[in-house]
Amino acid sequence: MKQLPVLEPGDKPRKATWYTLTVPGDSPCARVGHSCSYLPPVGNAKRGKVFIVGGANPNRSFSDVHTMDLGKHQWDLDTCKGLLPRYEHASFIPSCTPDRIWVFGGANQSGNRNCLQVLNPETRTWTTPEVTSPPPSPRTFHTSSAAIGNQLYVFGGGERGAQPVQDTKLHVFDANTLTWSQPETLGNPPSPRHGHVMVAAGTKLFIHGGLAGDRFYDDLHCIDISDMKWQKLNPTGAAPAGCAAHSAVAMGKHVYIFGGMTPAGALDTMYQYHTEEQHWTLLKFDTLLPPGRLDHSMCIIPWPVTCASEKEDSNSLTLNHEAEKEDSADKVMSHSGDSHEESQTATLLCLVFGGMNTEGEIYDDCIVTVVD
């Protein structure tokens, strides 16, 4: 595996550089299809945690929860009872329960799921809420970025093998009312697909790529929940090729996608999409790129800088200031108050865990790079 520079606790990361995080403790084993979520500090905690939930390897699907404590710089295996084993599921943290992680759908070896479960990290228990309305059909839907406020948005997903569900409705789950709905939409929705990314930025949801049979999609679609109108976008710039099983995060006016697979193999590239200018940029890096991968997961984390060796730049910011922005990515920091040490200067990183290449090698590494 490629040797990336190691980012030590407190170090200030440089732009245009991929790093490895070498975190001691009980780390997750190599896996694919897991979810990766950042939960801000609660109670007396000084720093937030990254939660790796579920996933699979060729032998089994997982029901475990691993946490990376960003204050202690340590992995822990949390003994959380009640999760049904699953991989390629969706995870989200709704505004009404900012201290809990919800998961939807996914699959295990016996088939697809369409149930919801909720993790209470304080009690280390999973519960299955009573949902009063019919859910979407069972499907894989691998995302940690498709929620706005209290609502998770579901479009498409995997049926079996390379075939997607044929459902092109937009399904909306409200965590406050515990109901599913299928609102009327305008315009033409994307064609059926799975392995696409679905990411929320402000009031808009963006869908890129995906797969149906042997066809890889390179199109970009958007729906604004304020008018529920689908649009197929025609962005400028260096657009990504058709791919699937990549991952995405949103930060301010930018959407970042990393990795995925094409007919030629796994990708090691990261693209930035400007949501207002509708422009793609292939990001250039000064150091080695990480191994290409698919079916990984990623999230945005605040990285505390305590021993910066270079002059502060625009990537260093205070979390309290950043929390004033009203977009989906700023949930990373919006729940942390002045009582937490996390209001110190920090740098925002995109954290990627796990995944695999097209030769069958499965990863257990944790890599990061600066986003702005």
UniProtKB/Swiss-Prot annotation:
Name the predominant localization. cytoplasm
Stretches the record annotates as Disordered: 314-340
Q: Which UniProt keywords apply?
A: Cytoplasm, Endosome, Kelch repeat, Membrane, Phosphoprotein, Repeat
The UniProt entry, under InterPro entries, shows: Kelch-typ_b-propeller (IPR015915), Rab9_kelch_effector (IPR052124)
Kelch repeats (start-end): 49-95, 100-146, 151-200, 204-250, 254-303
Q: Which GO terms describe its cellular component?
A: cytosol; endosome; endosome membrane; intracellular membrane-bounded organelle; trans-Golgi network membrane; transport vesicle
- Composition-biased stretches, type Basic and acidic residues, lie in 321-340
Choose any GO biological process term that the UniProt entry carries and state it.
Answer: vesicle docking involved in exocytosis
Q: Does the keyword Membrane apply?
A: yes
* Superkingdom classification of source: Eukaryota
- Subcellular location field: Cytoplasm; Endosome membrane
- Cystine pairings recorded for this chain: none
Question: What quaternary arrangement does the UniProt entry report?
Answer: Interacts with PIKFYVE; the interaction recruits RABEPK to the endosomal membrane. Interacts with RAB9 in its GTP-bound conformation.
Mind telling me what this protein is named? Rab9 effector protein with kelch motifs
